[in-house]
Amino acid sequence: MSDEAVAAAWAREDLEALSERGLRRYLEPLDSPQGPVVRVGGETLVNFSSNDYLGLAASPTVRAAALAAVERYGVGTGASRLVVGDTAAHHRLETRLAAFERAEAVRLFNSGYAANTGIIPALVGSEDAVFSDALNHASLVDGCRLSRARVCVYPHADVEALTRALAETPARRKLVVTDTVFSMDGDVAPLRDIVAACRAHGAALMVDEAHATGVLGARGAGLCDELGLESEVDLRMGTLSKALGVMGAYVATSREVADLLVSRARPFVFSTALPAHLCAAAEAAVDAVEGDPDLRERLWRNIRRFADGLRGLGVRAEPRSAVFPLILGEPERALDAARRLREAGVLVKAIRPPTVPEGTSRLRFCLSASHTVGHVDLALEALRSVGVRRG
């Protein structure tokens, strides 16, 4: 039997097991641009599954910036930034993001996953300890594992438990990592208290602002911006692929850390550089976030309307972000609810393990500035008519 046949047999066995548990995934391509209404599988549906929180993915201004950069730089970079893949567009975006984040420096990565799995191992190793919230994104979890540091997982948002762990864990270096907005639950980290705990125990702090960038803060720069904690957090990872509508990620930090990542962050060193046209598009998106506060206000009007509607249906809803989970329990229940909502014209995907813990499969609604009042009300009416209730 060939190696290919052996691997295929393994895959068939695993796929059957996933199917039996309701955990097999399938791809479903869109036939339209990303937006509040999409074409998928021959249907036109109102989209509540996208992280395009400000509707910038199809923005004419952002698209025009990308097209102009394609004319100048072409579509690919050909190498890592350390070889010949670096362009003026990369440096302009890093400078623009540093100003946006009020940071000394910014370093770009190809994705949030690449950033988190590169940054953490670049800073800590086998003599060190990393303290990670139990509900952190998988990229932070994997970054911790790859670092070979001792990993201390503290209960979700439990600063007392974090403080005890910091006090009781001997290590050369201590690094705390947390999401600011938790992607599957939509809640917000108790960041002021985490900063205080880090300060008291000499720990560095890294936050993942992926679902806060463009959504929270007076300037749209995330939870650190909202709380005025930019100077208190050592590393702030942000994404270009959610509210900014493009692709890629970055870390806002000190000049020294940004310089170290050029030599130490393996996804940065060993990946072909982000295409220059995406850098240009992201720069235009940052300009839109800072220059058009009405974008965020439209988003927050939709968030408040949806939260009010959920409460009217008897569902507890706290409008702290653009993410609203409806936890239903077992995968089959979430899949069935997603199917019935789709029949009502609403696209919201079922989120199942391992993305979320066992027994907490859910529908995850994501609001966007590009949703109309009619879109929001359609989703609420669909929930009411199909009788979806929290498990």
Swiss-Prot record:
A single BP term in Gene Ontology: biotin biosynthetic process
Enzyme Commission designation: 2.3.1.47
Top-level division of the source organism's lineage: Bacteria
Pfam family, one: Aminotran_1_2
Pathway assigned to this chain's UniProt record: Cofactor biosynthesis; biotin biosynthesis
Purpose: Catalyzes the decarboxylative condensation of pimeloyl-[acyl-carrier protein] and L-alanine to produce 8-amino-7-oxononanoate (AON), [acyl-carrier protein], and carbon dioxide.
UniProt protein name: 8-amino-7-oxononanoate synthase
